[in-house]
Regions:
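Bacterial Sec-dependent N-terminal signal peptides
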Residues: 1-20
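Aromatic (Trp/Tyr/Phe) and Gly/Pro-enriched flexible surface segments
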Residues: 17-109, 118, 129-131, 146-265
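Extended, low-complexity, turn-rich repeat/linker tracts enriched in Gly/Pro/Ser/Thr and Asp/Glu
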Residues: 120-128, 140
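Beta-strand signatures of extracellular beta-sandwich domains
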Residues: 133-135
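Short aromatic-acidic-glycine turn motif
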Residues: 139-147
Length: 268
């Protein structure tokens, strides 16, 4: 039997296909109503791990976009974004927050993926840092909030000394990830230990001093909302950033080759 090896056009081209579900945080069933953490309830396919970030959306009067208790910033894409603590100058060295996003399908072993997200330093943040990254995982870490095995091992990280200090423009963090296979979730946050998390005062006391204890101008505000005032005081000792437009895109395509027998060829 004559066998003709032919490409039948069965090409599975995934190049350019966005894999992150709700990466711009637009799909939500509830409008955020409070500064207090709420475990990101009502935001489709987005979860917190351990301490909860804050969801900002233009539909809210308290945590709105562009104006909110953390400052003023338009979204990179759409009407919403996340706010998260990366590191802190106060006594709690574990004071940080993480956002977990779900992928449309598991990553494939040996395949390469373009990973990117956009960050912006909140106006009210007392400090800035260069430490933010991303980790892929096969498990849903939001259930138990366990991340200790990922600390010090980010799959993607912002370059050292590239401080996330821009309060106006969004800064892009990107790179390429070689998948192990089976990864279904992406977690964004600071994956370095406290001692490896550089911090600089947003408004240094003198020169370019590091770890200067700067009280934010927000403390001078006579805010009638006690919760908001409490968060503003905490913000003055934190490196707090905004997060938007998280993306994972496959690089290249897969081409499947099939066998074309003489019988199949005649049937076409």
């Amino acid at each position: 039997v004559l066998l003709i090896i032919a490409i039948l056009g069965c090409v599975q081209d995934t190049h350019g296909q966005e894999l992150v579900v709700n990466g711009s945080f637009e799909d939500h069933s509830k409008c955020p109503r409070s500064v207090a953490p709420n475990k990101l309830k009502g935001i489709s396919n987005v979860r917190s791990v351990a301490s909860s970030p804050t969801y900002f959306n233009s539909c809210s009067q308290v945590v709105g976009v562009p104006q909110n208790w953390a400052g003023h910033q338009t979204a990179k894409d759409g009407e919403g974004y996340m706010g998260m603590v990366l590191t802190s100058q106060n006594g709690d060295r574990t004071d940080r927050q993480y956002v977990q996003l779900e992928l449309k399908e598991p990553l494939q072993n040996g395949h390469r993926y373009a990973v990117s997200f956009w960050v912006n330093a909140a106006d009210g943040s007392g400090y800035v840092t260069d430490r933010i990254g991303a980790c892929f995982t096969t498990m849903d870490r939001s259930r138990k909030g366990v991340l200790h095995d990922l600390i010090g091992k980010p799959d993607l990280e912002n370059p050292l000394d590239r401080f996330l200090s821009d309060t106006t423009a969004w800064m892009k963090v990107d790179g390429t990830y070689n998948a192990k296979g089976g990864e279904r979730f992406l977690i964004v946050g600071n994956f370095q230990r406290y001692g490896y998390s550089s911090r600089k005062a947003m408004i240094p006391n003198s020169g370019n001093s590091v770890l200067a204890n700067v009280e934010s101008n927000y403390l001078e505000m006579n805010d009638p909302d006690p919760d908001r005032g409490r968060f503003l005081r905490a913000l003055s000792k934190q490196a707090y950033c905004l997060l938007d437009e998280v993306s994972v895109v496959p690089l290249g395509s897969n081409v499947s080759v099939d066998l074309l027998t003489q019988e199949r060829a005649c049937a076409i």
